[in-house]
Structure formats: C-alpha cells, structure tokens
Amino acid sequence: MAEVPIAVPVSIRDEVVPSRKRVKLPPWLEIAKPRLIPLLLATTLGGMALSESWPLPLPRLACTLGGGALAAAAAGVLNCLWEEQLDGQMQRTSGRALPSGRLSGSQAFLIAVALACGASLLLVAGVNCLAAGLSLLGLCSYVLLYTIVLKPRTTRNIVIGGVAGAIPPLVGAAAATGHVGLGGWWLFGLVMLWTPAHFWALALLLTDDYRSVGIPMLPVVKGPEVTGRAINRYAYATVAASLLGVLTLPSGGLFYGLMVLPFNGRLLQMAQRLGELPDDKQRAKGLFRWSILYLFGICLLLLLARTTMAADFSNQLISLLTLPPASAF
C-alpha cells in the first residue's frame, strides 16, 4: 500500500521570514533580537546626518552606534524576559530561547543588566550624557511603556508605544551636537508616523496568534478592514511628513526631496493595495517588508544628501529655479 504523504504545517514565522533566510542564533544572542538593531542604528545615523556637525569623528560615531546597539539588545532581552509565558503560548514565538528552556530567566536577566551597563558606560564615556540618557529612555519606554503597560491593554499600543523606536534619531542628534535640534525631532516624528502602518501590516499576518493570547492588536479588535484603512491613513501621514526633510536638512535638501518621491509612491501604492484586500496575506507581507526598506531608504537618502555632490546639485537646482525670466523682445 502506498504511503500517504503528510503535510507539514508551515509556521507563521516561516511565512513572514522564510527559514532559509534565517540563521539559527545561539540563545544568548537570539533573545537580544539582533535583527531589529540595524534599522534602529540607521535612524540613529539619520539623526546625526540632520545636524550641522555631520560627519562625526570616528571614535564618537563608533561609541554612539555601539552604545545604541547594546541598549537595543538590552531592551530586547528584557522584552523576552517579561513575555516568556506569553511567548510560550504563541506559535510564532514558542521556540524562543526562554519558553523553550534553552536559556534560564536568571541568565537572561544578567545578560540584560550587562548590556544596559555596557551601553551606559560607552555612551557616557565616549559620547555625552544626553545621548546616554535618551538611550536609557528608549530602553525604558520599550519595556515599561509598550511591553508592560500598553501592549496587553489597548489597540493604540503601537501608536503610543512607537515612541520607543523613534528615540534613536534623538540619540544621534544629541551625539552630534550635544542637543536635539529641529532635524532630530522631525525624524523622531517621522518614525512615529511610520511605525503603525509597518507594525499593523505584520499584525494582519499574525492576527490568530495575537487573538489566541488576548493581545488587543488592532486587527484582533477592529478587524482587517478597519486596520487596512488605518494603515492607509498612516501611510499618507508618513509620506507628508517625509517631505519636510527638505526643510530640516542643513544641505542637500532638494536632492533628498527628489530622491524620496519614488519611495513615497511605492509606499502609498502598497498601502492602497492592502486597503483594497486587507485579508490578503501576500499584500500584508509585501507592505511589511517594503516599510522596512522604506525607512532604511530614508536614512540612506539623508546621508547621501549631506555629501558634496548632493549639496552642489541642490544649489544648482535652486539657482535654476530662481533665475529671472528672460526679457521679452
């Protein structure tokens, strides 16, 4: 008798990030959520690029990015520690180091303390106290405000809790000048507006998982249609806010303004397509992935805008736009 093949269910995590693209990490590194750190460091660089002091001396740049990475890792560990029981109940997270028993809670706590202390020492000694304080604020807001207070209680958890992910630009600005100027606050606001559309796209993929443990994410409470409309609104707000970078950049603003248009067009297109069919997992996955590339792209454009080439381009364009009209004969 022929053997009947048994279908093996694909995990929700593999649907979002296929396993062939993921590398198995040791448990002490896994709980630090290292895949989230590069985008946080990119926005830190963006905050620096918006200051008059860019480029920074290499030692200060290295200390800022190193301290930021350690602080973000500490926040990730504390998040995993607090949500250990919750993670064990969800398909996507049940294999994490703590719920699977590959790492103990006491070990995780010691790792978090070491990371937080390392971040503070590096930022205080190598950068300045304001950057260190803002980094600590980001850590606390992620763990206390978002993870403990907001996430289990309200559909607005990511709207308000997104402040944690928006603090790195302030750290970058503080590292560059010792204070936070208009550019740093602009990028902070942009990341705040970007976060809901990014995260709700992921939440549409993980609705069943969140529902099973009672986490009131917007798709769980309001449904996919309402979520799709909300994603559209925040996508438009993100695009509008992104254009203000033209005014906040010390140089190269027009270069940035032109180069950001294709990024904005693609973001709006994908948000609109998801709004039309909010139950479509492929569209939700596509927007989630593009939103990550979008924010990386914004930060890259900010860095490129501060180059001599971009500054010259912007100045020449301004000259062309301000030429007096030719005299009529």
Curated annotation (Swiss-Prot):
GO MF, one annotated term: protoheme IX farnesyltransferase activity
EC class of the enzyme, as a word: transferase
Lineage per the UniProt record: Bacteria, Bacillati, Cyanobacteriota, Cyanophyceae, Synechococcales
A Pfam match: UbiA
EC number(s) given by UniProt: 2.5.1.141
Record-level GO BP terms: heme O biosynthetic process
Species name: Synechococcus sp. (strain RCC307)
Annotated pathway: Porphyrin-containing compound metabolism; heme O biosynthesis; heme O from protoheme: step 1/1
Keyword Cytoplasm applies: no
Membrane topology: Multi-pass membrane protein
Protein name per Swiss-Prot or TrEMBL: Protoheme IX farnesyltransferase
Entry's transmembrane regions: 61-81, 108-128, 130-150, 158-178, 186-206, 243-263, 284-304
GO CC annotations on file: plasma membrane
